[in-house]
Amino acid sequence: MRIADNKKAIFNYHIEERFEAGMVLEGWEVKSVREGKVQLTDGYVVIRGGELFIIGCQINPLGTASTHVRPDSVRTKKLLMHKDEIRRLVGKVEQKGFTLVPLNMHWKAGKVKCEIGLAKGKGEHDKRDTIKDREGKREVERAMKSRSR
């Protein structure tokens, strides 16, 4: 079940490859994720010391959060992947133009997972093409809908 999508990443980047990673979350974060209080748009993934971290992903605390814990909504969260997958990612990210971006957050077997994408930035022209394609699809859907009535 999907929790949150990063539509901006799909618009701004060509996604070359997708990977699934587990997330290390605190208790209040899991409760907020369950309520859907997640925002991935400003998030990105970095590799430090052979480990993956997601930065800029915002998980807003619930109003009923505990008083003895100070929730930090944009704290850096560790991502869990196998070492060989991380090594492969390091090799690809070192190539010019590649970056890692969070694509979506979802539940899998009761655990929160984050789908990250190996991405290459789009130019302005590519973004305009994406908008044109999207508008064309909308027009076709409208025509089909009005035709079926």
Curated annotation (Swiss-Prot):
Stretches that traverse the bilayer: none
Alphabetic keyword roster: Cytoplasm, RNA-binding
Subcellular location: Cytoplasm
InterPro entries in UniProt: SmpB, SsrA-bd_prot, SsrA-bd_prot_CS
Annotated segments matching region Disordered: 121-149
Keyword Cell membrane included in the entry's annotation: no
Tagged with keyword Cytoplasm: yes
Alphabetized Pfam families for the sequence: SmpB (PF01668)
GO terms, biological process: trans-translation
Gene Ontology cellular-component annotations: cytosol
GO molecular function, one term: RNA binding
Alphabetical list of Gene3D superfamilies matching this protein: 2.40.280.10
Function: Required for rescue of stalled ribosomes mediated by trans-translation. Binds to transfer-messenger RNA (tmRNA), required for stable association of tmRNA with ribosomes. tmRNA and SmpB together mimic tRNA shape, replacing the anticodon stem-loop with SmpB. tmRNA is encoded by the ssrA gene; the 2 termini fold to resemble tRNA(Ala) and it encodes a 'tag peptide', a short internal open reading frame. During trans-translation Ala-aminoacylated tmRNA acts like a tRNA, entering the A-site of stalled ribosomes, displacing the stalled mRNA.
Family stated for the protein in its record: Belongs to the SmpB family.
Name of protein: SsrA-binding protein
UniProt source species: Polaromonas sp. (strain JS666 / ATCC BAA-500)
Gene that this polypeptide is encoded by: smpB
